[in-house]
Amino acid sequence: MLAKALATADMLSGGRLTVGIGSGGREEDYRAVGADPKTQTIRDMADRVAVMKRVWAGEKITESVLPVGPAPVQPGGPRLLIGATGPKSTRMAAEWADGLAGITLDLDTGRQNELFDVARAAWAEAGKPKPHLATSFWFALGEADAARAQVHRHLRHYMNWIPPEFVDAMAPTTGWSGSDEELVATLRKFAAIGTSEVHLIPTSSDLDQVRRVADLVGDID
């Protein structure tokens, strides 16, 4: 059913769909659908992706079920990015993924580039084109203390499965906060290490922050 839904989205978007896949770390998400978190590994994910690719190729998965449509617009199916944050999962995904779409908590571009280098080497060893290298981070625009407090509040709300004292301990160094100019400088640092794409995760429902980011990104050379 997921393969069918993704193929349909690819068709409706004219072949512009990119899919992020990850095992996730919130056990309640698995409980909500009756899945066992212990079975959700990168290796199991590879098996599921293999089935989806067979569906997209028009193969019969079982003798009793006809091929499932529609066919995706993109040959072989939509681009798949693995939500990997470590070297082991990155290497294991090289056989089937088209790149990375993880998250950086502390915005350390040196550490991020080390993971990108692992991906570059793994994709080359697998005989595949260079990987798409995406990452993401939470952000808040504004005066330093107010923006950092905004990120902290968001983390407290979002990470409600983690003890509050743990969230409070990680909040000062998790995500990004600062001025418009500082955000542009940060994005340029990620561009310098070959980042293909940065997903900026809002920490406020204030649409003005999203509009400001859109203007800033549009002005980056």
Q: Which residues does each PLM region occupy?
A:
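Active-site-adjacent structural elements that line small-molecule/cofactor binding pockets in enzymes
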Residues: 1-221
